[in-house]
């Protein structure tokens, strides 16, 4: 409060998006996202579940599309990304998805699509593999692909990106589940939470892509693979599988 009193809002006060809620000191209702930092402002945006929800859409859009430097995460050649850099990339993906969702829910799906296309391009999976943090982006792209207010070209791009990212994440997570259900009881039980999360995420990926691209053969194959995965997991819950089912290795790849 002394800082705010002295600077009279003439100098900005920022909180990094990487800090936890304990560091918000009760000010999260007055946070506004401008990139990878929350700016403290004299406007009450509110919060949800203790998390800030304010976003300066146009300012953050300019930062993302024109000002941010990506530090080589989008490099074409082989690069080494350590755990810290991977975590930061995950944070970038999360915040850009939040920005895109804010545009889409305000009726500006075209701008939301631009942000998501940028996200996929500058944080490629070849350098930082996709994880479940990408699920909201996949679902949002699937929704944008069905937006009648966009051009056919825009809807097609959204569908292509949704399938590209969704298929890759689906393949990775379904492979994880297949590995887990082949384990003996002790290890299988220890992985129960990971299995539940992976099953839930793959189900949502398959469902959102099926809604957006119901006639796409790859999406249909993914839905069939999801059905087989559910059957295998259900059978495994009854005990070890003596004859594990054969899955289509190309589904979701």
Question: Where are the regions a protein language model picked out?
Answer:
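ER/secretory pathway lumenal C-terminal domains and tails of membrane proteins involved
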Residues: 1-253
């Amino acid at each position: 409060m002394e800082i705010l009193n002295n600077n009279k809002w003439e100098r900005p006060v920022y909180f990094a998006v990487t800090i936890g809620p304990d560091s918000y000191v009760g000010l999260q209702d007055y946070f506004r996202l401008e990139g990878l930092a929350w700016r403290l402002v004299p406007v009450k945006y509110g919060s949800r579940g203790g998390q800030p929800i304010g976003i300066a859409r146009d300012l953050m859009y300019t930062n993302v599309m024109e000002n941010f430097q990506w530090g080589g995460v989008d490099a074409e050649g082989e690069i080494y990304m350590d755990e810290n850099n991977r975590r930061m990339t995950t944070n970038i993906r999360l915040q850009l998805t939040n920005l895109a969702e804010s545009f889409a829910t305000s009726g500006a799906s075209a701008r939301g699509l631009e942000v998501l296309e940028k996200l996929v391009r500058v944080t490629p999976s070849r350098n930082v593999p996709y994880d479940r943090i990408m699920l909201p982006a996949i679902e949002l792209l699937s929704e944008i692909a069905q937006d009648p207010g966009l051009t056919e070209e825009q809807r097609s791009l959204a569908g292509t990106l949704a399938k590209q990212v969704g298929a890759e994440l689906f393949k990775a997570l379904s492979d994880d589940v297949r590995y887990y259900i082949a384990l003996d009881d002790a290890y299988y039980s220890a992985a129960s939470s990971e299995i539940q999360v992976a099953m839930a995420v793959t189900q949502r990926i398959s469902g959102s892509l099926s809604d957006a691209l119901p006639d796409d053969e790859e999406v249909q194959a993914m839905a069939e693979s999801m059905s087989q995965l559910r059957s295998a997991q259900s059978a495994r819950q009854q005990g070890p599988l003596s004859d594990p089912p054969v899955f289509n290795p190309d589904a979701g790849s």
